[in-house]
Design a protein with these regions (language model features):
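Donor nucleotide-sugar binding loop of glycosyltransferases
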Residues: 26-29, 52, 105
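Short, well-formed alpha-helical segments that are part of the catalytic scaffolds
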Residues: 24-39
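A short, conserved beta-strand element in the Rossmann-like catalytic core
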Residues: 51, 75, 103
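Hydrophobic helical membrane-anchoring modules
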Residues: 1-13, 159, 183-273
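Short beta-strand-to-loop acidic/aromatic patch adjacent to the donor-nucleotide binding site
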Residues: 92-103
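A conserved acidic beta->alpha catalytic loop
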Residues: 49-57
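Short hydrophobic beta-strand elements that form part
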Residues: 18-22, 69
Length: 273
């Protein structure tokens, strides 16, 4: 038993795990989120503040987090772009997104990382629909229904069999993040689903683990109107992906950065787009 534990610790030492926190007005929950992280396996915590109006930045500094501050609210997707860029600059091997609003359980980070460490996955989702009934855990019924419907649509469009696409608890290999053309993605909530479309196009392996649902007053949550717009943007993305896959209308958004660089070098250009 001792040999196995030491072996696991050595394996973890070989992988630099960076947690990224896309933050917006997270002052009430940031401390508890950070406290629950398994710090023995996390090498660095990066928080990107997207123009918060509360004390998020001050608390992040007090906690000693690696802090990056946007000068205004650019959006959830823009926040993630900064998160992943800075994580890769920090030489991360594995990047885990943990929302600082405490809606996802930080103590499950070892389970999120395990499929990547074992080579079974390039991307891991924390699914709220794999475990207990999410509505009994506080998810509004209309969010549950829309989540199920959109997940059904995306599974058929992308050829996957996931229980949930709309989770903010995600882990990536550095190679996966580097291969996707993230700069072409939206700065809004649809960013997460664009990442899925890119991952499928590039043949990246996606798996999921069960995580509990947490809904409480301090947790951030999109309104009904925001969720409706989000749903429509997903349907547009699915159509765009279908046109790309069929060859009717190709999109650079779904091409790997390495492939685009090779193509443009052959064309006599010196930079990737």
């Amino acid at each position: 038993m001792q040999v196995n534990v030491q072996s696991e610790q050595r394996n973890r030492c070989e992988k630099k795990v960076v947690v990224v926190m896309p933050a917006y007005n997270a002052a009430r929950t940031l401390r508890m989120t950070y406290a629950d992280l398994p710090h023995d396996m996390v090498d660095l915590v990066i928080l990107v503040d997207d123009g918060s109006k509360d004390e998020t930045v001050r608390i992040a500094r007090e906690l000693g987090l690696e802090l990056f501050v946007h000068n205004r609210n650019y959006g959830y997707g823009a926040n993630q772009k900064t998160c992943y860029r800075e994580a890769l600059r920090a030489a991360a091997d594995i990047v885990v997104m943990v929302h600082p609003d405490y809606q996802y359980d930080p103590t499950l980070l070892p389970q999120m990382v395990a499929p990547i460490e074992s080579g079974q996955a390039d991307i891991v989702f924390g699914s709220r629909l794999l475990g207990a009934d999410p509505m009994k855990q506080g998810m509004p019924w209309w969010k549950y229904v829309s989540n199920r419907f959109l997940t059904w649509v995306e599974n058929r469009a992308f050829g996957l069999n996931l229980s949930e696409f709309h989770t903010g608890y995600r882990a990536y290999t550095a190679e996966a993040l580097q291969s996707m053309n993230l700069a072409t993605n939206s700065d809004k909530f649809i960013f997460d689903q664009e990442v899925v479309a890119q991952a499928v196009t590039l043949g990246l392996k996606i798996t999921e683990i069960a995580v509990p649902t947490r809904y409480f007053p301090q947790a951030s949550s999109a309104s009904f109107l925001q969720s409706s717009r989000y749903g429509l943007s997903i349907l547009y993305l699915v159509m765009k992906y279908g046109l790309h896959k069929s060859g009717i209308r190709r999109s650079r958004q779904f091409e790997s950065l390495s492939r685009r660089y090779r193509i443009e070098k052959r064309a006599g250009l010196s930079r990737a787009v």
